[in-house]
Amino acid sequence: MPKSLTHNGVLFPQSFESKGFNKIDNIEISLLAEEMLWKYSPYMFNRFKNDEVFIKNVWTDLKPQLPKELQNKEFPKDFTKLFVAMQVASENLKLQKSEYNKSHKKEIEKEKNERKEKYGFCYKNGKKTEVGNFVTEGSRWFISRGDLRGRWVSSVNAEDVEINSSEKVPCTQEGHNWKKVELRDTDYIATYKINIGFGTAYVDKFVWLSANSEDKQKDNEHKYEKARKLLLKIDEIEKTVLKDVQSKNKLKRENALITYVVLTYGIRIGNDLGEDNFRDKNVRGASTLCVENMKLENNNKIHLEFIGKDSVPYNETMEIEPIVYEQFSKQLSGKKSSDKIYDLATSSTVNAYLKSIYDGEITVKLFRTAKASGLLAKEIQKREWKNLTDKEFKNNLMKCCLQTSLLLNHHKTVTEEQKEKATKSAENKIESAKNALKRTEESAEKKLAKLKKAKKDFKDCLEGKLLEEKLNEIKIKEKELKDKISKAEKKYEDTLKEVEFKQSALDINLGTALNAYSQPKLPISLCKYADKDPSLIYSKAQLKKFEWANKVSKDFWRKYPNV
């Protein structure tokens, strides 16, 4: 518990102002209905335009806000003209903002910096510490891959916000009061719930200390160091788990079975929060699987098929130890397809079990971090890293990260439209590289032909030292031109490899594993070894977040334990 925590509270987004679309077919609509329609209009033209669940949910929440005369319309078809007009108006507003004069832009920037200084920092035990996003979330359509996608998220008021502070904090919303102000032993300065679908669901939100804050930096470093130490004991832990799979104690046996699956294949424990901190009852993980999610196959193989966190499907066949296969066979016996595989074990009992077999702080998430970091180290240690171009270096490292992301099942939804766009972009890139190579080859071949003729002419009319000098000059130019062709060919080959990799990883979220599960000292030490700038791999925000990793030696990646 901090002795003191002081700050100026959180801010609220500006309320929606009418954009002039307050009538439909000469029928007046409410400001809320206009806001809902305005904020839906972009979705008419992106990946949600054909999402039936999203559209159905939007209409569920929008319809009651419209006058009765408009409730019989077909949504979204009968609103198409309105949405097009709204998008045109939206683009015009963006254009107006881009045309602000310098003094106006400076004034906006000044106000932004003043807000940041006043609300973007807190004082924890007297020490100034940066806060993350100090503005509460605004009203919007709920974007996720779960069944609630397309429901309306209502705006937040001060009465919804609990403030974590050791002193009174004046309310920043005029005419309102905070729900509660008290000092808590947490890393957030405020918490509130967002209301989805007019009371259908509520989701907790937090205003955390910034990832760049000293406390967060220390926590991050500590997490990855714990994961490294855990890797050193992983073989010993796996032996214990295999022994406990045969335990006469049913709870211990179930805990060990779940741990085995998590340890071996990096599957999430289950019962965790998805996008927007929402727990979807249809989402499965290692501890929440039903009989229908697991199929026993021949040769000690099981097939797992379920919907995981963030509605990402998991569909894999895996080979397991014979004793584990035998226990799963017993576990499934006599159960209906809708029954849970485990009768006693939960995510909480698994974490308690892990603490009982390992002397140190441990959770399933830490196991996933350890496995991800160990696999990244293994992939990195397989390769040569000297004398690579920046593009080669980045592509090779991303290929290593791909294996980590596959282990963690970090997939993302890719629509047919996005696939087509990516394919077209790939084709254009290859065509452009092919044309560039062709131009280089044709230009160089013409020059080489001229040099060949010049060489013959010199031999016919010159001799001695002068001839030798001229032939040497031609030899140098020929080498330069051949090198130019070789470089162009290499560039073309690199483009083909890059495009092939991007296409293969189209539905993989490479960033999550790199940013949240993989020891950042590995890429940073590798960059030092290969004399590359870490900004090739990490964004500015990530580099700031991982500032603590900068002191790493250039050989750290060589010595890191792998899996």
PLM region spans:
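Acidic, low-complexity interaction regions
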Residues: 1-174, 179-184, 190, 356, ...
